[in-house]
């Protein structure tokens, strides 16, 4: 997680939300909730949000990596990856996919992921749902927390197909 400190820390707070301020600040450091890496040139690359990280059988999985692989498929317009509850692993990867081509099947997606050199087997989606659209913010970012809520309903209704 990316954490920062500044002499102006006292200027940062959650307005009228003391609980959140205490949660995000610790001993003068702001815990941003962003996950990233620091390279040899001292640049920080943000790779996702801590809240979006999936923990499956003790492995940390970042949705952006799986989304990038899914989005390489020629019949995929875009995708969103989230974690769904699993009794054995804690969470497993679920993929929501918007198709460019209506002939796209779950089997094609599964085959694409399992043959990708970019994904280890623990990162393969275990459930898929082909949808018409994904929720986005006004700036175009996918809203993963809405997808997690949607997945709860889809699991209850049998719409997420486990593979």
Which positions does each model-derived feature cover?
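Short arginine-rich
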Residues: 149-156
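AMP-binding/adenylate-forming catalytic domain of the ANL superfamily
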Residues: 118-142, 158-163
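Conserved ATP-binding loop and adjacent catalytic segment of the adenylate-forming AMP-binding
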Residues: 9-12, 26-27, 157-159
